[in-house]
Swiss-Prot record:
Belongs to the UPF0248 family. It comes from the Archaea. This is UPF0248 protein SSO2687. It holds the Pfam family MJ1316.
Length: 81
C-alpha cells in the first residue's frame, strides 16, 4: 500500500480516534533522527508531500517511515511493507 493511501485510510477510517495515531519521519535535526507527527496536525496529503495545519511545513513523503498507534504501540504501516 502506498503511504498516501495508508495516511488517508487512517484519516477517514479512524477519524474518531485520530489523536491516537502518529506518523514517524526521518528528521536530521533530532537526536534520534526520528520525529513523530500527530495525525491531528495533518492538513492534507498528495502524491509527493504531507502538508501540516497552521504551518508552512511540507514534508516529502519519502521521509515517512511508519504510521503508529500510540495506545498500544501498534504498527499500522511501515516503509517497505
Amino acid at each position: 500500500m502506498k503511504i498516501k493511501d495508508a495516511i488517508n485510510r487512517v484519516r477517514w477510517k479512524y477519524k474518531e480516534k485520530i489523536d491516537d495515531y502518529v506518523i514517524v519521519i526521518k528528521d536530521k535535526l533530532t537526536e534520534t533522527g526520528l520525529k513523530e507527527i500527530p495525525f491531528t496536525d495533518i492538513y492534507t496529503v498528495d502524491n509527493n508531500y504531507l502538508y501540516l495545519k497552521g504551518e508552512d511545513t511540507i514534508i516529502p513523503l519519502h521521509r515517512v517511515l511508519m504510521i503508529r498507534r500510540k495506545s498500544d504501540d501498534a504498527l499500522i504501516w511501515k516503509r517497505g511493507d
